[in-house]
Amino acid sequence: QILPGDSNPGETESIIELTREQIKLEESAAKSKIIETQREQEKFKIGVIDIPSFYRDYRALKSGDEEFTSTTSDVRRLLSNLEKDEIDALVIDLRNNGGGHLTEATALTGLFIDNGPVVQLRNANGRISRLDDPDPVPRSAYNGPLLVLVNRYSASASEIFAAAIQDYERGI
């Protein structure tokens, strides 16, 4: 029920019904492809992973499903497939990625750095908390050349990921 701010006492409230749609994670899921290129006489395979948003299936996670869908688990699987195809370099495409789950940005960063802090957060009281790479194994999932693409529509979690990769001098 709503009552406009400029209404008079005793006016009837309006009822507005909202229906929340189920978001299909498949539409936002990370996807990969390989671009083959040649420079002089040498051929190269460039793996490209497009990440439209940072997502996590909290319903599956809460129910105890260890195979829950998330940006990090999907990218880990895509990386494994790209490495089987013997890519020479990797591009993470975050253009037009408006962000999403911060925990996924920190976890995804952990696939490319050995360990360490990813971002610091300051709350309204000025208290600072640090989010580290959550992976307890100090080893990255991919060690080759890395490029992260962003544009003016990349925001929030995508900016945090891109900045961490740059701060750790892990990619450009």
Predicted regions and their residues:
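Cleft-lining beta-strand/loop regions that shape enzyme active-site pockets
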Residues: 1-172
